[in-house]
């Protein structure tokens, strides 16, 4: 199964490691990449690149991310994200627009989501 890697997982994996052991999510991402199952969507790409201040690091990350195929985002994904948002709110669950768009794209395209963001566990109780 192809895997949509969320910004939170990428951020942990891309963080410079000094003395601490490498986080498990980094090994998961490496395995997903090795297997050719990693996909990305524009909003995740934007979030990752928006956090880079140094122009050289920005360019390096942009070039690395270009290796991963973009999963298209359809009009129906935005509509489903809005539906999921409304369902979540009715259950007292708040979600960001990007998170719920990730859920919608994953549902339509039958993608797994790799994330360290615990909010996705709450979304899963609704969708």
Label each region the model flagged:
Residues 1, 30, 103, 107-127:
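Acidic, PIN/NYN-like endoribonuclease modules and their adjacent C-terminal/linker elements
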Residues 6-7, 48, 81, 106:
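Generic structural signal for small/hydrophobic residues in well-ordered secondary structure
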Residues 1-40, 50-63:
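Short, well-structured N-terminal submotif of metal-dependent ribonuclease cores
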């Amino acid at each position: 199964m192809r895997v949509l890697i969320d910004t939170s997982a990428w951020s942990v994996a891309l963080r410079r490691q000094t003395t601490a052991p490498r986080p498990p999510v980094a090994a998961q991402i490496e395995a997903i990449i090795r297997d050719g199952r990693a996909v990305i969507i524009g909003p995740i790409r934007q979030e990752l690149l928006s956090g880079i201040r140094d122009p050289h690091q920005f360019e390096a990350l942009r070039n690395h991310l270009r290796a991963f195929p973009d999963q298209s985002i359809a009009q129906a994904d935005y509509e489903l994200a809005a539906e999921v948002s409304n369902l979540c709110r009715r259950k007292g669950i708040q979600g960001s627009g990007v998170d719920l768009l990730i859920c919608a794209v994953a549902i339509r395209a039958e993608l797994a989501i790799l994330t360290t963001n615990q909010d996705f566990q709450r979304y899963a109780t609704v969708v």
